[in-house]
Amino acid sequence: MLFYKPVMRMAVRPLKSIRFQSSYTSITKLTNLTEFRNLIKQNDKLVIDFYATWCGPCKMMQPHLTKLIQAYPDVRFVKCDVDESPDIAKECEVTAMPTFVLGKDGQLIGKIIGANPTALEKGIKDL
C-alpha cells in the first residue's frame, strides 16, 4: 500500500504583470503625432525607442539605454509606447518591439529592430 505524504506546502500567488518603468533621466515620452513631427525638425541627433509595457526584450534594453544616454549627451533620446501612440508607430512603420528609429538633421535615417545593444550603439556613433 502506498501512502502519499506531501513534502512541502506552499501558497501559489498569481503573477503580477511587470510594467515598464523608466529610470532614464533625460528622456522624453512622445504622446502625439504633432509632437513627434516637431521633435524630428528640432533635433540634430535623435533616437526614438518604440516599446511596449508587456515586451520582455524592451525591458532587457533599459539598462543599455541608460548607459547610452549617459555616454552620448549630444543625442536626444525619446521613447514611444506603441500601445498608447499607435499613430506615431504607424508613421515610422514599426512592426516589432523594440524598434529604435534614428534621426539626424531633421530626417529619419535608420532603424534598428530588436534588442541589439551593439547595433544600437553603432547606429548612434554613426549619427
UniProtKB/Swiss-Prot annotation:
Q: Which domain of life is it from?
A: Eukaryota
Where in the chain are disulfide-linked cysteines found?
A: C55-C58
Q: Which residues cross the membrane?
A: none
Organelle targeting sequence: 1-21
Q: Site annotated as Deprotonates C-terminal active site Cys: where?
A: D49
Per the record, its GO cellular-component terms are: mitochondrion
Site for Contributes to redox potential value, residues: G56, P57
Q: Which GO terms describe its biological process?
A: cellular response to oxidative stress
Kindly give the Pfam families that the UniProt entry links to this protein: Thioredoxin
Molecular function terms, GO-annotated? disulfide oxidoreductase activity
Which PROSITE patterns did the record assign? THIOREDOXIN_1, THIOREDOXIN_2
Q: Which UniProt keywords apply?
A: Disulfide bond, Electron transport, Mitochondrion, Redox-active center, Transit peptide, Transport
Q: Where mainly found?
A: mitochondrion
The record ties this protein, via InterPro entries, to: Thioredoxin-like_sf (IPR036249), Thioredoxin_CS (IPR017937), Thioredoxin_domain (IPR013766), Thioredoxin_H-type-like (IPR050620)
In what residue span(s) does the Thioredoxin domain sit? 22-127
Q: Where in the cell is it found?
A: Mitochondrion
Q: Where is the active site?
A: C55 (nucleophile), C58 (nucleophile)
Q: What else is known?
A: Yeast has two cytoplasmic thioredoxins, TRX1 and TRX2, and one mitochondrial, TRX3.
| Family that this chain belongs to | Belongs to the thioredoxin family.
Name under which the protein is recorded: Thioredoxin-3, mitochondrial
